Amino acid sequence: QRAYRHAHEPIRADILLEEIERLVNQTPWRYSDPVNRVIVGRLFLLRGGDPRQVLELAYDRAQRDNPNIIDSSIATAELALEKQDYALALSSLEKAVEVEADNPLVYFLLSRALGPTDPARAAAALEKALELNPNHLLTRLFLAERLIDQEQYDAAREQLVQVLQVNPRHSQAWAYMAVIAHLENDLSGEQAWHTIASQWPEEDADVDYWIGLKLSQKYRFTEGATYQRRALVKNPLHTRARIQLSQDLLRLGKEKEGWQLADAVNQQDQYDIVAHNLVTLRDRLAGFRTLERDGFIVRMDRREATIYGERVLALLSRARQSLATKYDVILREPVHVEIFPDQRDFAIRTFGLPGGAGFLGVCFGSVITANSPASQGDQPSNWEAVLWHEFCHVVTLQKTNNKMPRWLSEGISVYEENQADAGWGQSMSAAYREIILGDGLTPVSQLSGAFLAPPSPLHLQFAYFESSLVVEYLVENYGLETLKRILQDLSVGMPINESLQRYTGSLKLLDQEFENYARARAKSLAPGLDFSALELPEQQDAGSWIAWQQAHPDNYLGLTAYAAWWMEQEKWDQAEKPLRRLLELFPEDIASGNAYQLLSIVLREQGTTEQEQQLLEDWIARDGEILPPRVRLLEIYKQNENWAQVDQLAQSVLAINPLRPDPHEQLLAAAHARGEKIRTIEPLSALLEMSPVDPAAFHYQLADALLAGGQPKLARRHVLRALENAPRYRQAQQLLLQLSDEADQDPAAPVEKTNSPEN
C-alpha cells in the first residue's frame, strides 16, 4: 500500500487499504502480533485515528510484546517526529539502532531527532545513512533542505536531482525545486515546479504545505501562510498545515486567527505538542499587562511591567527614532514585543517547543519575543542591548520584506549595537583572533551556513561577530548608502550574492578583500602581546615563576597565570605588576578572568579605592553586560556622595537587571539627596513591587511625590494604601487631608489595554 502511494497509484493503494481494513475487522485476533499491531496502527492513522491512542494501544504494546522488532520503534519515531516530540523519537530510535544497526532509515530518523539538540551527532547519523545507502531518498531530501537553509541553492538542486533520478514522481523533491525558484525570485520556475509536484492529487495539499513550511523557515511568513491557506482549501483538516498557519499568523502579529487555529488543532489532535503548548501559553499570556506607545504593543508580566515597563517603551522609542530614520524605513505598525519571565514560555512562543536556551530574543519582522532578566539567573544580559538588536531586525526585515539572509540581518543588528553603545554588541577578542588567524573565517559568500550546526557555542558567537565585521567592512569601504541599496535590492527579490557583486565587483574579490581586512584587524589586536600557548612552569614556586616570566615577559596566558599565582599567595603588590602590563598591552580584553577583574580584586585588597574606582570605570565603559563592577562602583559613589554618578550608574545597572532592588534604592537615595521629589516616583513604584520591609513608608513617600508631580488621584490611592498598612501613620493622615477628590490623570502614563492576547 505504501509502495503504491509513493508510486502515485492511489486507486490501487486505496484498494489495498480497504482490503487490510476488511481483514482486520473480520478476524482481529489474527492481527494482534507485534508486527501486525504496527500495521493496524498505521491504518488507523490513515483513517484519521487519534495519534495518542495509536501510540499507546498499537505501537507501545507492540514494543512491549517484542522489544526486538524494529517496526514499532520506527513507527513510533515517525509519529513522534511529525508531532515534534523529539525526546520520544530519540528514545525509540536508540533502541532501534541496537536491534538493526545497518538500516539507513533508522539513522535518517535519528538525525532528525537529534537535530534540535545535538547537531554534531545529527550530522554523523546522516552520514551513516548515506554510507549504508547512497540513494536513500529521505536522507538526500533532508540534505537538500539543509543546503536551502544555507542558501547553497545549486548544491541543493544537485541533491534533488539525485532524488528525482531514482523516483521522478517524488512530489516533495519537486516541491523543494519550487521553493528554490521562489527564493531566487524565479516566479515562472516556481509555478512550473509546483505544477509538476501537484499532478498527483493525493499529495496535492502536502505540496503546498511543504513549500509553505520551507518558506516560513526562511522567514517568509507571509508567503508561507499563503501556501498553507492553499493547502487547507484542498484539505481543510490538514493538521500540519493548520498548526503551521497558526504559527505563521502569530509571527505576523495576526493573533486572533492564529490563536483560534491553535485551539482548533489542539481539539482535533491532542497529541500535537505545538498546538497544546501554544494553547497553554495563550492562557498564561492572558495574565500579562499590555502597554502601548509610538506604534509598539508591549506585553509583559504584570509585576515586571510596573518595575521597568516604562523603560522598555522609552528604549523602543529611541531605537525607532534612531534606526528607522537611519535606514529610511516607514514601519508597518503595530510592532508587537513580548517579554517572558519564563524561558520555556519564550521558547514555546518563539519555536512552538521548549528549548532555544541560547536565544535572548527573536524577531519575525513585526513581532519580537524576548527573555526577561528573570529568566537568566544572576548574570543576565543587557536587556536594552537585546531589544535594540531585535528592533534593528524589525527595521531591516521590514525594509527587505523578510528577504534577507540571516548573516546580513544578524550582522547589521550587532553592528548597530556597537554604534549605539561601545559596551554593547561584540568586539575582537583573543578567541576570535585565534579563529581568524587559524583559517576559521567563513567566506562572505557562504556566511549563512556558519549559523547552522556550528562546531561549538564559541563558533556560533563568532558567526555573529564575523557577520558584523562584514557589515563594518562594507560601510567603511562602500558607505552606508551602498548597504541600504543592498537591502533595497533584496526587497525586490535579488539574491544577496548578486547584489553584493553589483557594488563590490565580484564575490571572489569580496571574499579575498574581506579576509585581508579581518586578518589585519585580528593582527592589530594587542600587537605587543604574545598569544602563543606556552607550557607554564612545572614547579609552582616563586623562583620558577619569576624565571619563567623573565623568559616569556609578554605572554598573554603567562601574565594572567603569573598574576593569579601571586594572588593565591595574597601577594597583592607582586600581582599588580603583571596585571598592569596586561592592561597596557590589551585594554580591550573583557573575557572572563580578564585583567580588569583580577586587578580590581588586588586594588580592593590594597585599599586603594581611587585607583579601584578608575579601573572599574574603564572596565564598564568596555563591557555593557558586566554587573559586579557596577554594583561595587555604586557603593563607592554613594560613600563619596557623588549623587550624579550614582544616578547615571544606577540607570546602567537597571539596563542589565531592573529586578534587583539595590539600583532602585540608589536612585531613590540620589533623588532624596538632591531634593528631587518627583524623581522618586519611579524607584518607589518599582520598590513597592519587591516586598519592602516598610510598605507604608514607601506608599506615603510615593503619594507625596505624586502630589508634587500633579497626580492627586494616584497620590490619594497610595496614601490610602499607606494607611491600610499602618492606620495610625500620622503623616499619611495629614497628607490625606490635603488631597482633593479631583485629580488629573497622568498624560505620560502608558495606556493599558485588555489582558487578552488576541487584542
Residue spans for each PLM region:
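Juxtacatalytic substrate-recognition/specificity segment
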Residues: 16-23, 57, 91, 124-125, ...
